[in-house]
Amino acid sequence: MSKNYWLLKSEPSTWSWQDQVKSKIDMWDGVRNYQAGNNLTKMKKGDQCFFYHSVNEKSIVGIVEVHKEHYPDPTDKSKKFVAIDVKTVKKLKYPVTLDRIKKNQKLKEMPLIKQSRLSVMPLTIDEFNEILKLSNINE
């Protein structure tokens, strides 16, 4: 079975990379957008996800892995949305900022640019690998 790649956005004041690292494995909950929620249902155990700090930082800071596939989000009273569990994989050597992503021609079709409000989005393997390359360069 092939691995899929994703980007998960989080507000650092709500759930930061540091929180994720301390927890090691935790629930990714609180998604209330239908498209983002549908993306959660497509995730499979072992899929790789970039951890993106939204709001002020606007940068990819780490990698997590889907540890448990979707289940009902216990924080959702309407019972319409799902959660997943993610496991910390590693911190990126250097954060990859939204500005750097926008300037990279290989990433111009990324949902992060095309659908900037979406909090859970698919990535191609080429996009994932290009971001990994950028994370090894300090700019």
State where each predicted segment sits.
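Compositionally biased, charged N-terminal/linker segments
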Residues: 1-44, 128, 135-139
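GIY-YIG nuclease signature motif recognition
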Residues: 8, 64, 124
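Short, charged, solvent-exposed linker or helix-capping segments at domain edges/interfaces
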Residues: 19, 95-101, 132-134
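Hydrophobic beta-strand signal
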Residues: 50-51, 65
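Short, charged beta-turn/beta-strand-edge "cap" motif at the junction between a beta-strand
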Residues: 52-58
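Aromatic- and Lys/Arg-enriched surface recognition patch
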Residues: 61-121
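Long, low-complexity intrinsically disordered regions
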Residues: 109-139
